[in-house]
Amino acid sequence: MEKLLRQQIERIVQLSDVEFEFVLSHFSYREYRKHQYVVQAGDAAPNDHFVVKGLLKSFYIDDAGKNHILQFAMEDWWISDPQAYHNRTSATLNIDCLEDTQVFYITIDKREQLCAAMQKMEYFFMKKTTAGYIALQRRILSLMSQTAEERYRQFTQLYPMLPGRLPKTLIASYLGISRETLSRLNVT
């Protein structure tokens, strides 16, 4: 379990065994069942979650009751409500489990303590955050400028493991199209 977290970190910074144990001491571990909420809109969202096993989605429910999926997170990915996490405010997003899920999570306070104590981890989190901003920009530009088919093709190219693990209704919601439109694309 810890090995996956270490591999994730060491793609960016190298850690000795002692350093990794120190890093790990700032994280906690939790298991969730399928359909269980990790975060609910309106509640505190003090944790950033690293997925060891399972699949989650973050989504927003608008005033009309429509779900808008912002992100999926599977093994070796991170998920949180960034606004609530960094600003220590109530969550705007919901995060729930699409499969039984295992996560390591770190509170914003523990993250700040870790970064203050260890420059390598400050660099790691900076690089992780930058990658998240880049992915968000790519997603926004995709929604603004690509056709439904182009968005679907990009989704399957960027995340080839996800279509087999997700119902088409969730993929359609993520792409900002109806389930019927996704079916008309004649995708498999």
Predicted regions and their residues:
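Localized chelating/binding microdomains
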Residues: 14-15, 30, 48, 102, ...
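Amphipathic, Lys/Arg- and hydrophobic-enriched alpha-helical face
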Residues: 9, 32-39
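Residues that recognize and position ribonucleotide moieties
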Residues: 30, 49, 71, 96, ...
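A small-molecule sensor/coupling module
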Residues: 91, 110-147, 151
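Cyclic nucleotide-binding regulatory module and flanking cytosolic helices
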Residues: 1-28
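Cyclic nucleotide-binding regulatory domains
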Residues: 37-98
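Phosphate-/nucleic-acid-contacting segments
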Residues: 146-188
